[in-house]
Amino acid sequence: MILQPCAVADWYCPLPFRHAYVDSTGVAACCQTPRQSVSLDQWTTSPYLVELQQQILQGNMPSVCSGCQQQERTHGRSLRTDSQRDYNYQRFVDTKIDFVDYRASNICNFKCRSCEPAFSHGIAAEARNNTVMAKYYPVLDTKTVAIDAANIEWARENLAQINRLMITGGEPTYMPEIQLLVEKIVYDQLDIDVMITTNASFVNDFWCEATRLYPKLHWTVSLDAVGPAAEIVRHGTKWSMVERNVRWLSQHAASMDINTVVTNLNVMQLAPLLTFVHEIQQESRTPRGRHGDNGCRHQFHVSQRPYYLAVDNLSQELQDRAIRHLAQCLTLDLDTEQARTIHGVLAQVQQAKFDSVLWQRSVVFNTELDRIRGQNHLSLYD
């Protein structure tokens, strides 16, 4: 059943009614809510989901939704508001999973500093072998994790009812089981919007072939910095390869976004990133690319406290320098979303109060990673 578009004053999110997030720890309504120890075929009738839906239908904001509330207050948008837009502001009261966020495995060739063991087997290995790093992450029982085989089978068997399939990882382009799933969709020309989040390090020609053959394949490229800075923030990056793939996708993909996680590590690397993304947006515009007059979208996730990599978790000296850098960013040729985000980050950093404990936690984390990986994160602040 579909009701009228919900009023702005209502707290409504469509995801608990149409979406399932699946990773190695369970199933959830979205990536920001607690995982439940059920399989996909049990999810739609689970007591947890039913209670969550009832709270939303009564116009109440569930406590697990506070992250979106904070994002909306600070930056004017969130996963919830993006999802409302994606579903054309419809208000559902029944449950039919037509959108699966499928995070099949933590196999990944990168070890990004803002990531965690559940999404990178390399980080899982570091956490298991280092007592300092173990304090920052939930340590996994094994280095490599994958979602239950029953969930994989459910996804394959229910492709007919799925309208959108989001595939992340880990790095999906390095997972044979993901390639098999996408091959079926592409070669059978199924009517599914396939959204793959990638670090753009792929070398298998299949992904270029799929991009050419299947117009409903959407790429989200994770870019948090460019050049040598990218190789620190997103360890494992070979920038020349990533840049080549991003430029190729910008001209050949039917749909591509760039996603940036903003932390206290890359807050002073945003200007060169924004400049590079502007080039990619130019290359992706029609007729050179396939993204109309505006080019591909650049979206952001801004890290918040109490996370130790929160964008405003800076020493006083670095806070002052970050403010100057962000002001410089605002002089660049930015699109509306970029400008809004930079204004929001600038306001957040300007209003931040120094937290010595949280800052020290960030220092210890990054210094230990420098030692393990032979890097120097302080160069990110030069």
Residue ranges and their predicted role:
Residues 177-183, 205-211, 269-273:
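Distinct, well-ordered alpha-helical segments
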Residues 75-99, 108-110:
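Recognition helices and adjacent regulatory flanks at domain boundaries
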Residues 2-84, 302-382:
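Accessory C-terminal segments flanking Radical SAM cores
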Residues 64, 72, 107-111, 116-119:
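Short pre-active-site segment immediately N-terminal to redox-active cysteine/selenocysteine motifs
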Residues 97-107, 116-149, 160-176, 188-206, ...:
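Core AdoMet radical
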Residues 209-216, 250, 278-281:
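Acidic (Asp/Glu)-rich catalytic clusters
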Residues 64, 151, 158, 181, ...:
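Alpha-helical packing segments of well-folded alpha/beta enzyme cores
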Residues 264-280:
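Catalytic cores of alpha/beta
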